[in-house]
């Protein structure tokens, strides 16, 4: 649930907030956010959570109000808790999310619902970029709500094992948001450890929220749920009408060529989110596009968390129209063959556990970062899979960033045929070897869900005129230029991150001057590439040659200060020559 109102497709006009008998302070905050009616998932989950005290397992699409479905009951219970009203603070609720970006997003929403609570309820985000001293000082105040990634929470618990800073025995609510992503990020081991800290047998209410519900949830349901109510919002039909999916078969270099043509000629109207499979790939594409005057910004795990959060916020405010995001989840999902998993799901359980433990060790590197799922990118018109993901599940997560909350959207994926692999070494990518195999799985998976992915054929005759200058620009983006750009970007963002953390807290009006889409010039700057000659444009986009603009009948008069042309003797250089003795 974003801070804006949910889509009309998900709103339940037949129900009202008054029917839930919520605390007046909470109703006032909800009204201030502009939520006139609860969404379908909220209308189903909130009564079950408040009146029947049931555990909730909910499956609903992005933009349907899942966050509000668990945050609203949590805050209502805290506002009506006599212990909280008396000022006796204890940790009452744990909210677990897969990424730092999502934890910050949830905290912002919680704070907006607590605006009329008179500071009786405190909420903290453990996954924020805070020092141990700051975390300890926040925990000493016994916040009622803790938002964190599983790994960060376990880290804090283990560090303070012999201290009285954090005690989870008073917890009455556990929420795991984006459950499938939490599991795919390798947090299962952390959740198993968390079980020993929680009072599971003492009226612990659990919310498990996700866009998909599958067999992976059974283990968590057994561990944390006692009497769950499973809610499934059947919204595939409404989503199907809003999302259009295409794939285009292309060569390794033509990916860059087509990206240049698409963005330079503004073939996509609105904001675009481009996914690449590694950090170098993102900087190569950024440096390539910059030479044509196409401004874009980068989002990857190397950047400081404060900068990443600011980039997402500015993108949502329409400051940037083009964002290149590195989806590094492919690094560990590629090891798992989806087809084998479907065929032998119940076989080799012991070896599967071994693979899971090995996989989780590799995932520790990137567990705090994620953009393909959960992060609230608003009003994305198009998702461009510049590099095809390595699993059909990752594809679903990526395209879920567009056509959200009932709005229309498009997804375009570049697919590399197997015969084209390795022909252009500089533009090649190792994961592209499996593109056709992954595409078959994606088409199969989407057809099961009632979606259609259509092939798209670019008119290469129209594009061919841009090839020469594209090749010229691509040659300028060397590996050295990429390395220097990464260093330069990291230095800039470290400075920006420090400013965001300190100076801009006191001077929010100056925050607008901080931009993340500044040019990272390659070694060779070619300014002429920023202009597209008229002869390269398609005929429909060219200006009418007959319309040459206003041509005056008489030439302009000579400027007053301009010297007149010499005449007579002065005009002849031989006659005007003076010999000086």
UniProtKB/Swiss-Prot annotation:
Domain Helicase C-terminal: 260-461
Motif range (DEAD box): 177-180
GO CC, one annotated term: nucleolus
Residues the record lists as binding ATP: 60-67
Residue span of region Disordered: 334-368, 546-581
Domain spans labelled Helicase ATP-binding: 47-231
Motif Q motif per UniProt: ranges: 15-43
Reaction catalysed by this enzyme: ATP + H2O = ADP + phosphate + H(+)
InterPro entries: DEAD/DEAH_box_helicase_dom, DEAD_box_RNA_helicase, Helicase_ATP-bd, Helicase_C-like, P-loop_NTPase, RNA_helicase_DEAD_Q_motif
EC number: 3.6.4.13
Cellular compartments annotated: Nucleus, Nucleolus
Family, as annotated: Belongs to the DEAD box helicase family. DDX56/DBP9 subfamily.
Job of this protein: ATP-binding RNA helicase involved in the biogenesis of 60S ribosomal subunits and is required for the normal formation of 25S and 5.8S rRNAs.
PANTHER family on file: ATP-DEPENDENT RNA HELICASE RHLE-RELATED (PTHR47959), DEAD-BOX HELICASE 56 (PTHR47959:SF21)
Protein name in UniProt: ATP-dependent RNA helicase DBP9
Native organism: Scheffersomyces stipitis (strain ATCC 58785 / CBS 6054 / NBRC 10063 / NRRL Y-11545)
Lineage of the species this protein comes from: Eukaryota, Fungi, Dikarya, Ascomycota, Saccharomycotina
